[in-house]
Amino acid sequence: MTVADIWIIMPLAILAGASLLILLLGAVVPGRYGTAVGVAACVGAALWALQLQPAALSQTLGVAFTPFARFFTVLFSLTAAATLLLSHDHNVRRDISGEEYPATVIFAAFGMAVVSASANLLILFLGLEALTFAFYILVAIDLNRAESAEAGLKYLLLGAISAACIAFGIALLYAAAGTLAIPEVVRLTLSAGAQDPIALAGWGLLLIGIAFKISLVPAHHWTPDVYQGAPTPVVAFLSTASKGAAIAFLLLLLPSGSGFKTLHTPLWWLSLLSMLVGNLAALLQTNLKRMLAYSSIAQMGYLVLALLTGSSEGFAAVILYVVVYTAMNLAAFGAVASLTESVGMENVEDYRGVGYSRPFQAGILALALFALAGIPPTAGFIGKFFIFYAAFRGGEIPLAIVGILAAAVSAYYYLRVVVNLYMHAGDAPESRKSASMTESIALSAAALVILAVGIYPSPLLRLIDSILR
């Protein structure tokens, strides 16, 4: 390995090294520097990825820091940093201590970065499972709540099935193509007219495994239980960066043009069922985290709708929505985490009047819900607009109409929460009035992205266009 190779993989090395360093520091000075080191490492990895020059973006050790990989490494690193900021005071309230929490968050970000930079299927699988193993720990890390352990067990069992599907699918694709290099696998197994049954079985298993990772119907049943039982900052991370990594997985594998037709039908049904089931089930929920869980299922259906086009325009809409969705869900779950006390605020009705007692957190939550509903001038409106625009341009008109109607239905359950936030001031719980400094930083950053992209999306659109060239 040359110095140039080390330079290229330094963002990965920073994240992996920081995870180990936090654990070592915990043995010397327990409970003091984990969050600070973790946030610094995430910001450092993001900055390093940003400064890598195109001439240096060669492949080494099965990874290649292309503009695509750099973009997602920055996104995942900053999302991990925001998660650590949201977690700091929440974990104190929940009595979640120890360096394993920040170390595992950083290790999850490392796995996500590996996924986005993968140049062959083996590294892609290892990165995906590295982040999944990290979430097995994070989901069950609240030892004081039986719900957390239950959620962790469900996620572990179903995650093992997903991993088996993906591993078997990769094995079949290797048998069909004779190589693990992603471009060659795509060319040999999804070229126009390719009908190798082994390759088709491999792609089918891959789609089943990824459907679990991003909570597409019918592989969605784990989502509401895990979201309800896991610590809320972990849910913020799981619902954003984890799904972003799985979407990056798909974008690396899915071809554009005629080869995409092979996968069109299964993806079409996954999108349709996810949009309908996610939104209709969310209407029936009284628990806020379960409602947001079903909402996330529908949101993934919108993303797959744009993927269906098989065009660069559709892929650009997907990347835009990944960024927007990350900011929206970080703000929503981050605000819920900040509002949640040791007793907990579980149901939508528990938030009645909270807008008056804790205006900052309630305002962030309301903004996030407006964005998730796709109301202008938030980033959610811009994201949905480009998804449906790409779908219409790509010929997916019936499914796009279903998506628009489903999005209109979703406005009811999002706005129901907002109404509760600002009605009946006397019902507001008496407790601390403001967010902590770390929570305020993370929530303000997410809100800024929601508003900035909603009002002036052009810089982000140009950046996305450049990484897809």
Curated annotation (Swiss-Prot):
MF annotations from Gene Ontology: NADH dehydrogenase (ubiquinone) activity; NADH:ubiquinone reductase (non-electrogenic) activity; quinone binding
EC annotation from Swiss-Prot or TrEMBL: 7.1.1.-
Any one Gene Ontology cellular component term annotated for this protein: plasma membrane
Keyword Transmembrane helix: yes
Pfam family membership, one: Proton_antipo_M
Superkingdom of source: Bacteria
Record field: catalytic activity: a quinone + NADH + 5 H(+)(in) = a quinol + NAD(+) + 4 H(+)(out)
This protein's UniProt keywords: Cell inner membrane, Cell membrane, Membrane, NAD, Quinone, Translocase, Transmembrane, Transmembrane helix, Transport, Ubiquinone
InterPro entries: NADH-Q_OxRdtase_suN/2, ND/Mrp_TM
PANTHER family, per database record: NADH DEHYDROGENASE (PTHR22773)
Family from the record: Belongs to the complex I subunit 2 family.
Assembly mode: NDH-1 is composed of 14 different subunits. Subunits NuoA, H, J, K, L, M, N constitute the membrane sector of the complex.
Designated name of the protein: NADH-quinone oxidoreductase subunit N
Organism: Geotalea uraniireducens (strain Rf4)
Gene transcribed to yield this protein: nuoN
